[in-house]
């Protein structure tokens, strides 16, 4: 083995298998791009993004860790969200929850 070498198993890796998901259509109504990271509580994203915010409470983007989705001004797209796991307690972000979901 070489230091840092990865030895992946054969086959596909399914992210967030078995976790609840929801699909929302998001429109950037602002005049600047908005980029959202993989683990940001989607309910609390920039107010320039228009979507069913209540449907996104307790969810984040269903994308690989460390990645992000960028919404250009005027752009509309559909994204899949996945439920936050663990204790489901949210602090920080935009300060809209600050406790248990």
UniProtKB/Swiss-Prot annotation:
Signal peptide (from-to): none
Its EC number(s): 3.5.1.5
Keyword NAD: no
CC per GO annotation: urease complex
Entry-linked CDD domains: Urease_beta (cd00407)
InterPro entries: Urease_beta-like, Urease_betasu_sf, Urease_subunit
Record field: catalytic activity: urea + 2 H2O + H(+) = hydrogencarbonate + 2 NH4(+)
Subcellular location(s) per record: Cytoplasm
Gene3D superfamilies: Urease, beta subunit
Record-level Gene Ontology MF annotations: urease activity
Pathway it works in: Nitrogen metabolism; urea degradation; CO(2) and NH(3) from urea (urease route): step 1/1
Keywords of the record: Cytoplasm, Hydrolase
Domain of life, per lineage: Bacteria
Class of the enzyme per the UniProt entry, highest EC level: hydrolase
Keyword flag Ion transport: no
GO biological process, one term: urea catabolic process
HAMAP family: Urease_beta
Subunit structure: Heterotrimer of UreA (gamma), UreB (beta) and UreC (alpha) subunits. Three heterotrimers associate to form the active enzyme.
Family according to the record: Belongs to the urease beta subunit family.
Name recorded for this polypeptide: Urease subunit beta
Native source species: Ralstonia pickettii (strain 12J)
């Amino acid at each position: 083995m070489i230091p840092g070498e990865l030895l992946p198993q054969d086959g596909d890796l399914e992210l967030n298998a078995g976790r609840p998901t929801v699909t929302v259509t998001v429109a950037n109504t602002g005049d600047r791009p908005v980029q959202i990271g993989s683990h940001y509580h989607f309910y609390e994203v920039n107010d320039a993004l228009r979507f069913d915010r209540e449907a996104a409470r307790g969810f984040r983007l269903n994308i690989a860790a460390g990645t992000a989705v960028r919404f250009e001004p005027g752009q509309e797209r559909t994204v899949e969200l996945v439920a936050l796991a663990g204790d489901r307690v949210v602090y920080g972000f935009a300060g809209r929850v600050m406790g248990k979901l």
